[in-house]
Amino acid sequence: MSTLLERTKSVQELKKRAAGKTSANPAEVAKAKKVLRRLYSWDEIPEWQRDNDFILHGYVKETSSFIETFKSLFYLHNESVNIYSHLIPALGFFTVLLLDKSTIKVFATTTWLDHMVIDLFYSGAFACLILSSSFHCLKSHSLRIATLGNKLDYLGICILIVTSMVSILYYGYFEKFSLFCLFALITVSFGIACSIVSLKDKFRKREWRPYRAGLFVCFGLSSIIPIFSGLYCYSFSEIWTQIQLFWVLLGGVLYIIGAVLYGMRFPEKICPGKFDIWGHSHQLFHFLVVIAALCHLRGLLNSYELVHIKMENGIVS
């Protein structure tokens, strides 16, 4: 009890000293202010931390300490929502990955390969979200750690795209395995290429930006190839059902909306400072990414169930 009272008095004394209400030497006052202050404004943070000039306050200044950076998980700042909006879903995907035998509907025809394909998507979603959350948590550490985190954040995006496409294509082209292998190879190749340009410093330089952007655009557009091929091999209604195009397209639209909001810095651009903690574009992007991933999951599970219903009825073998 005495320890608690001593701590309370110490905190109160620090507050008084920081406010200048008690006599103390300048060094003690500066130390008290440093202890009490956690958040800074745009003008007070280092140049390398400045990314969105429409977010004016709520920054965690460079800590150069993993312990201090970790402590930022337990108080509110302008990255808190970005951290938890992906950390919580990441833990959710990790949980269903561990419990996949009880979360995936089992048919008489279900095999270990089905679990592997669906777990592939769970793993990709977990990797993307946990890397994103870690980046937003650790970016206040230092320029070196922030740069590394940003690279891994992009790597997570590549992993999610690859695992999403490969998993849904497996069931979409279940009856044409050779085509699935071809499209999977194209997807993985683009994924590796985009991962390399995301991780290598050489390709992150300004002069490489157009090529890097073009590669990611081609990566995204490569998903159109299986759709048009499907229209050649199947009827529109069949490909709509087998690849679950409604859910796939809905997820894609949500990704695009999120990217547009992020690129336009909306809504903070129209009212700088108002969305510093809650509701700025990067947060909206995060939520839309999670919803899009859930849409894809719904489509994947529907496609899986459709294939096995057909197998049980003897329509496919």
Curated annotation (Swiss-Prot):
Residues 100-110, 175-176, 234-242, 298-317 are extracellular. One of its GO terms (molecular function) is signaling receptor activity. It is found in: Membrane. The keyword Lipid metabolism applies. The chain crosses the membrane at residues 79-99, 111-131, 154-174, 177-197, 213-233, 243-263, 277-297. Induction: Regulated by OAF1 and PIP2. Highly expressed in presence of glucose. Expressed at lower level in presence of glycerol or glycerol and oleate. Highly expressed in the presence of saturated fatty-acids such as myristate. Its main location: membrane. One of its GO terms (cellular component) is plasma membrane. Belongs to the ADIPOR family. This is ADIPOR-like receptor IZH2. The gene is IZH2.
